[in-house]
């Protein structure tokens, strides 16, 4: 259903299910990165290393408090076993480090351990900022359709829509794709209204619940009265990481290529559909007007 809307932000997914369930058909069925990693860890990684999935624990460190709710979703369990066992926010992880006397600034830099899916690209890095998910996806779509690599995606402020940026990607013979990026749930209502009325001009829309994206998530470390400066600094750092990466496209990640070659077989295979995709349900609380008899009974009982 067009326009397609991103599904990696659990705060946004919760908002759709609880407030605007009529938008569910527009949500991409792709799981969030956390949910995908968990499902692959409990299947491919466990199989490769001969580990019983029941004995494996996946702990996720996230800037987002809504990731805790996502980890508990019934759709993200296999035979009752959650794909993600525990979610710590960045603030919670910082408390753990402090409790054990660990100061990251005093520790020499080193490479991460690489047990599983540890090679990362610029496209993976920019997921953390508003517009990054869209750009990462469009880089791969452009390559699949045209066989070429896409340059920088240019966004312009959308007229009459606060906190919304829009752009156009030319896919050659396939035509042009109109994209939009919105962050902050208070700013998405205008677009939702256009979708309901059949007037939305976009094909693909990225929505992030937190202003600025995940870099300013509810679980991030904050300082009083200076969070905007820190958000800008984090954003610039992420774009520098993207620019410095030798590989900037998801489809060129060697780990992703090996994943499909050795396990998933191909995009949209049965195994890929099972492990990389999910579904949503209407969780809207229906308001019920009490009848006269019910009201009178409450009055009578005081």
Residue ranges and their predicted role:
Residues 1-302:
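Iron-sulfur-associated redox domains of electron-transfer enzymes in respiratory
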């Amino acid at each position: 259903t067009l326009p397609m809307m991103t599904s990696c932000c659990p705060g946004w997914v919760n908002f759709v299910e609880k407030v605007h369930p009529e938008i569910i058909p527009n949500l991409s069925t792709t799981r969030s990165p956390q949910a995908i990693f968990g499902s692959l860890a409990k299947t491919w990684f466990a199989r490769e290393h001969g580990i019983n999935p029941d004995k494996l624990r996946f702990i996720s460190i996230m800037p987002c408090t809504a990731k805790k709710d996502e980890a508990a979703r019934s759709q993200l369990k296999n035979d009752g076993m959650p794909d993600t066992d525990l979610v710590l926010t960045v603030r919670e992880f910082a408390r753990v480090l402090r409790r054990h006397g660990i100061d990251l600034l005093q520790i020499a830099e080193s490479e991460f351990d690489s047990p599983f899916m540890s090679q990362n690209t610029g496209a993976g890095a920019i997921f953390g900022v508003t517009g990054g998910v869209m750009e990462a996806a469009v880089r791969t779509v452009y390559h699949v359709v045209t066989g070429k690599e896409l340059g920088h995606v240019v966004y312009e402020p959308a007229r009459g829509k606060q906190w919304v940026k829009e752009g156009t990607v030319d896919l050659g013979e396939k035509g042009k794709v109109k994209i939009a990026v919105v962050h902050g749930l208070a700013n998405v209502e205008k677009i939702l209204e256009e979708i309901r009325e059949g007037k939305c001009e976009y094909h693909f829309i990225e929505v992030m619940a937190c202003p600025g994206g995940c870099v300013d998530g509810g679980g991030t470390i904050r300082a009083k009265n200076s969070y905007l400066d820190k958000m800008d600094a984090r954003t610039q750092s992420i774009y520098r990481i993207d620019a410095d990466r030798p590989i900037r496209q998801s489809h060129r990640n060697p780990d992703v290529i090996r994943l499909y070659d050795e396990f998933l077989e191909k995009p949209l295979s049965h195994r890929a559909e099972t492990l990389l995709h999910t579904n949503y349900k209407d969780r809207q609380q229906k308001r019920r007007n009490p009848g006269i008899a019910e009201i009178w009974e409450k009055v009578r009982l005081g």
